[in-house]
Amino acid sequence: MTVRKVLCVDDSAAELVLIKKIVLSANLDFISATNGKDAIQCAKSEMPDLIFLDIVMLGMDGFAVMRELQKDPATKDIPVVFVSSKSQKADQAWAKMQGAKGFVPKPINEQAILEEIRKF
């Protein structure tokens, strides 16, 4: 699979700006959502090739978003990479158990984001 369109979900405007810069520098399309509900709707309407998903968000957290995406046949195969300050081994293991294909700890490192994109 070739990644052409990336959805980034984070309730932090600063994090979205940073990831947007990285994604655009790789000549990819960038779309964003700032909460879980919008993330699910955006994933269904935009059908991105990859989702970078924050774990800690108000309302619906990243794990709940992941479960909803996996329930829907249209979105269940979109790879999700969690991006979070919750980066202890237990958090990473839980993310993998939820179906995540990768994990990038915050603060965000440009190389880590680009490596995740290259995986797909």
Where are these predicted regions, by residue range?
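C-terminal output helix
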Residues: V17, I108-I117
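Two-component/phosphorelay signaling modules centered on CheY-like receiver
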Residues: A13-I31, K119-F120
